[in-house]
Design a protein with these regions (language model features):
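Charged, amphipathic alpha-helical linker segments immediately N-terminal to NTP-binding catalytic cores
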Residues: 1-33
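Conserved NTP phosphate-binding and transfer environment spanning the P-loop NTPase/kinase superfamily
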Residues: 16-21, 28, 162-310
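Glycine-rich phosphate-binding loop used to anchor ATP phosphates in small-molecule kinases
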Residues: 115-173, 219-236
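Hydrophobic positions on the alpha1 helix immediately C-terminal to the Walker A/P-loop
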Residues: 61-65, 80
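Conserved lysine of the Walker
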Residues: 58
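Conserved nucleotide-sensing/catalytic segment adjacent to the nucleotide-binding pocket
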Residues: 77-79, 86-135, 154
């Protein structure tokens, strides 16, 4: 699927609010479809595994699906799989080809504990979810929360490695969902904005606004993030029971001004430099929409702030 730049810019000027609402409505229908499919599968398993690469909007989508299930009378619990990261041990941590610790590797997760928890939940037992502090790269003693599923309740586990064979082979009946922002933008049949750039820009803006990371830091990690996606995430997407695109035609117009500032100076020598320097001129092809027009529950609020899921 590809979006048309001329149509995007026309709607940006002529009816920005209507444009946003229409795009958000398409996404909302995908969420509702996923909720219906999850309920149908709940006879087989109460577990939902939601995966997708960085910047796909997994957290918001997981919460929206949980809300859709609640509207159908099904209580849903949410668990972020990031809390299952192991305490980093430099002696045993997986490494990138360059020798750095590979935080994109599924081996950073405590797969044994995850699989035990999935089995315990299916058996009606209580689990105690660990708590991970990214600032110290370690698991803390106190658990983040506990969950015990009652009859007809569902739990949504969200994380980049949720569809990895190390999990799904042991729990084949779990409902598997994959999301990613992946539509290109075209002008006269030519790709002028790559689908992966939606996620790159989302990640760069979010990390700058909320994680104290300057753009050089985020962009320097992008090559390894993409390597990790190709090795550890994308190969498992076809195992999903349902896939959908989480990009929005209007979002670059909303994020344009913030992203333009962050991409105005890309350090030479950075890996994938030739690709990254194409992002700024591509951004200049889009118009601008005031972010105040974006609803508080919109997915892109996960990246620009001001959302109700923060």
């Amino acid at each position: 699927m590809a979006y048309d730049l001329k149509d995007i810019n026309f709607r940006t000027v002529s009816d920005p609010k209507g444009f946003i609402d229409e795009c958000d409505g398409v996404y909302a229908k995908r969420v509702e479809t996923a909720a219906d499919m999850i309920i149908e599968n709940s006879r087989r398993s109460p577990i939902v595994l939601l995966s997708g690469p960085s910047g796909s909007g997994k957290t918001t989508t997981a919460r929206k699906i949980s809300e859709a299930l609640e509207r159908r009378g099904v209580r849903a619990h949410y668990v972020g799989m990031d809390d299952y990261f192991r305490t980093v041990d430099p002696a045993t941590a997986p490494r990138t080809p360059e020798g750095d610790i590979d935080f994109e590797s599924p081996l950073c997760l405590d797969m044994e504990l995850l699989n035990d928890h999935f089995s315990m939940l299916a058996e009606g037992k209580r689990i105690y979810i660990p708590k991970y502090e990214f600032s110290r790269r370690m698991r803390v003693i106190e658990p983040s929360k506990s969950i015990k599923l009652k009859k007809d309740e569902i739990v949504v586990f969200e994380g980049i490695h949720a569809l990895n064979d190390l999990i799904t082979q042991k729990h084949p009946d779990a409902f598997k969902l994959y999301i990613s922002a992946r539509s290109n933008v075209e002008f006269n049949g030519e790709v002028v904005f790559k689908g992966t750039w939606f996620r790159l820009i989302r990640r760069t803006v979010r990390d700058y606004k909320f994680r104290g990371a300057d753009p050089d830091q985020t962009l320097s990690m992008w090559a390894n993030v993409r390597r990790g996606e190709k090795a550890n995430i994308s190969p498992f997407k076809n195992k999903a029971d349902f896939q959908f695109d989480s990009s929005f035609p209007y979002e670059m117009a909303v994020m344009n001004e913030a992203a333009t500032k962050l991409f105005s100076s890309i350090p030479e020598g950075i890996e994938r430099y030739d690709e990254l320097r194409q992002v700024l001129p591509a951004l200049q092809l889009f118009g601008v929409i005031d972010e105040s027009l974006v609803a508080p529950d919109a997915l892109i609020r996960e990246f620009i702030g001001g959302g109700e899921y923060e």
